[in-house]
Regions:
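Membrane-embedded, lumen/periplasm-facing catalytic core of multi-pass transferases
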Residues: 331, 487-559
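Membrane-lumen/periplasm interface segments of specific transmembrane helices
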Residues: 112-115, 298-385, 410-411
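Perimembrane helix-loop-helix junctions
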Residues: 82-89, 285-312, 567
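Hydrophobic, aromatic-rich transmembrane alpha-helices
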Residues: 17-25, 183-201, 294, 369-400, ...
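Membrane-interface alpha helices of multi-pass inner-membrane proteins
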Residues: 46-50, 264-280, 286-291
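Membrane-embedded, hydrophobic transmembrane alpha-helices
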Residues: 1-88
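Hydrophobic alpha-helical membrane-interfacial segments at the cytosolic entry of transmembrane helices
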Residues: 91-106, 270-271, 296-324, 402-406
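Active-site lumenal/periplasmic loops and adjacent helix-entry segments of GT-C-fold
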Residues: 103-212
Length: 645
């Protein structure tokens, strides 16, 4: 990658970082609080332009606005010595230095990654690539994104698109960077709170940096790893980890209250909108957060909290309704394959009890694996939250209300999950993608707990009668205890850092080498054979053998051809057209090709079943041939062997 290409890829990142630094200086907030506002604003800003099918205009306008604001804020910092001094402090702050280090680390680790998993290839990786290539709304028959995937909200794909929009070529690894970057910037507020508290406590040296590093490593890497393992952030493109972290950030801001200034309200507003734009289930978190803020507010701040909650809820509902309206306009149905019905409260209760018996967290130790069920995780997290409030002399009743809100949100998520997937659960007695979906709730709770710990950890060592220091002072081994705690914190930080780096280096989306090579071979054959132009060229891909085994081969081929104006028209379930698969006859197959307006049909291989069942339309072909391409002739209702000269 030459310097020009590297700069084009990193230009949006540099723009976001510089603007956040200047914004934190102008508004007098920490960099860790400013960077989430900037990144979330990118998604919120681009969404109306995407809905209006003017994504390119929105991207250019956003870049211009950020550049103009950066120039204006820079001039202000030069003219005002107070702002200049504040900027220098922010540049030298621990949160900014940790941010720079984590960004460099993510750039290094994501450089050579490829999109490989199922949902990543057909949705979370394909969506941003389609936006980068065509810069058009991916809804309706003209979209390259499959119809079954079009109902997914475009929040994260829009962010991925902006991060790569100034590059001359699409980089798969930068998708992983964007996902990891999104998680990191949401952890920065926690890191900054810790650094502020420790500075006020006059802590210096290795302990100060150990605390900041400890919170960054635990929050950004260790917690998601415990929940998601091989399906977590930095190694996959699943949206559930970012959704859980954003939900935790949103709840933390809402519980903080809207009476302490405009920043908490703006943070809640942007994060609430982005929750709805990240995934459908984000609507539950968005509504629960503002309701929790209203329930937990005291009499003094009740009016401001109610007004702030009403504003956030209104914005969330407007965005949600606008997306539903778009889906209706383009006749895009929900990706669910069944109607949602009420099964009865007894069935729901039975389901919840069964779910409570499943494992939510797995800890792989040297000689054993410890599995912790979902209710145990909930009780541990909520118990720690209440215990933290007790020892830090915080308002215990308010903390009890917050814990109740979080518990009710988790239960509502479970019940909603049952309504959505009741068909597959009843038929197969299984819980599809349970660990990923439910992991969002656990990750949200863990974030709130870590945020509380960061806010109140100085209270744990403060001069409170119920504080830990009061207990420590009664001990004759006070000095030894404090010294052991310091060294233990440093040692734990080192171990977590090493383990986390090993996790990121070793954790990768995996695809078998034959599938990867064959997908590239199929894509190259199509590129060198079919005629392409500004209009999409539709190809029906036939793969001999079980369609489920060939799922990733189909998806990878589809993904590689997105930016080449070639669309694999059929979904993976119809790649096997023989009697062992879809069971088409020759006439039915021709009818399907014509009805789907396919320009070409490609056989990745000619098996004996394909040869015998479709010999009347294949013409001069032999068993064992690979990458055989035919042009679809709608007038003569036939397919003709095609070789581009």
């Amino acid at each position: 990658m030459d310097f020009g290409m590297f700069f084009s890829v990193c230009f949006p990142l540099l723009l976001i970082s510089v603007f956040s630094l200047l914004l934190s200086t102008a508004v007098n907030i920490g960099f860790g609080r400013a960077i989430p506002l900037t990144v979330l604003s990118v998604i919120v800003f681009l969404y109306p332009f995407y809905a209006a099918d003017s994504l390119r205009t929105g991207r250019i306008l956003l870049a211009i606005v950020l550049c103009v604001l950066c120039i204006a804020l820079t001039v202000c910092c030069i003219l005002k010595s107070e702002l200049s001094d504040r900027l220098k402090k922010h540049v030298a702050s621990t949160s900014f230095l940790i941010y720079c280090a984590l960004v460099c680390l993510l750039l290094l680790l994501s450089a050579n990654k490829f999109v490989c998993l199922w949902d990543s290839l057909r949705l979370w990786g394909a969506y941003p690539k389609a936006l980068w290539t065509y810069e058009t709304r991916q809804l309706g028959a003209d979209a390259i994104v499959y119809p079954i995937m079009q109902s997914y909200v475009p929040g994260m794909p829009l962010l991925c698109y902006f991060m790569e929009s100034f590059s001359r070529s699409f980089h798969e690894g930068f998708l992983y960077f964007t996902y990891g970057y999104f998680d990191v910037i949401l952890i920065l507020p926690v890191i900054e709170i810790v650094t502020e508290k420790t500075r006020k406590a006059a802590e210096k040296g290795y302990l100060f940096f150990a605390k900041a590093l400890f919170f960054s490593i635990v929050g950004a890497i260790v917690i998601p790893w415990l929940i998601y393992k091989n399906y977590g952030p930095y190694v996959t493109l699943y949206i559930d980890p970012p959704l859980g972290i954003l939900a935790g950030y949103y709840f933390a801001v809402c519980f903080e209250g809207f009476d302490s200034g405009k920043v908490p309200f703006v943070s809640a507003l942007l994060s609430g909108i982005c929750l709805v734009l990240l995934k459908d289930s984000g609507m539950l978190f968005a509504v629960a957060g503002v309701l929790g803020a209203a329930i937990c507010s005291d009499k003094v701040s009740l009016k401001k909290t109610m007004l702030g909650s009403a504003g956030v809820l209104t914005a969330v509902l407007v965005v949600w309704y606008s997306w539903r309206h778009l889906l209706n306009v383009y006749s895009v149905s929900n990706h669910l394959s069944h109607e949602i019905t009420h099964p009865g409260w007894s069935e729901i209760l039975r389901f919840v009890v069964n779910v409570f018996q499943l494992d939510a967290v797995e800890l792989d130790l040297v000689a054993a694996r410890i599995c912790i069920s979902f209710p145990v995780v909930l009780l541990i997290l909520l118990g720690l939250k209440l215990m933290l409030a007790y020892f830090s002399s915080y308002r215990f009743k308010r903390e009890l209300l917050e814990s109740t809100v979080m518990l009710m949100t988790a239960i509502a998520f479970l019940v909603g999950y049952y309504f959505v997937f009741q068909s597959s659960i009843n038929e197969e007695n299984d819980f599809p993608s349970y660990s990923r979906y439910l992991g969002s709730v656990i990750l949200c709770l863990m974030y709130v707990l870590e945020y509380d710990l960061a806010v109140r950890h100085s209270g744990l060592i403060g001069r409170h009668k119920k504080g830990l220091r009061g207990w420590i002072q009664t001990s004759h081994k006070k000095k030894r205890f404090i010294k052991a705690t310091k060294y233990g914190l440093v040692a734990l930080t080192v171990l977590l850092s090493v383990g986390s780096l090993l996790y990121i280096f070793r954790g990768k989306e995996k695809i078998t080498a034959p599938d990867f090579v064959q997908a590239s071979d199929i894509a190259d054959s199509l590129l060198h054979s079919v005629e392409t132009g500004d209009k999409l060229t539709d190809v029906y891909l036939c793969i001999p053998g079980d369609c489920k085994r060939n799922e990733r081969l189909h998806h990878r081929t589809y993904f590689e051809l997105i930016d080449e104006h070639i669309r694999i028209k059929n979904f993976y379930l119809t790649t096997d057209i023989t009697s062992s698969g879809s069971g088409y006859s020759s006439g039915q197959f021709i009818d399907i090709l014509i009805a789907d307006h396919c320009d070409y049909v490609m056989f990745s291989g000619i098996s004996e079943d394909i040869y015998h069942e479709f010999s009347d339309i294949l013409g001069d072909v032999s068993v064992g041939e690979s990458n055989v391409i035919y042009r679809v002739n709608a007038k003569s209702r036939s397919i003709d062997r095609f070789n581009k000269q």
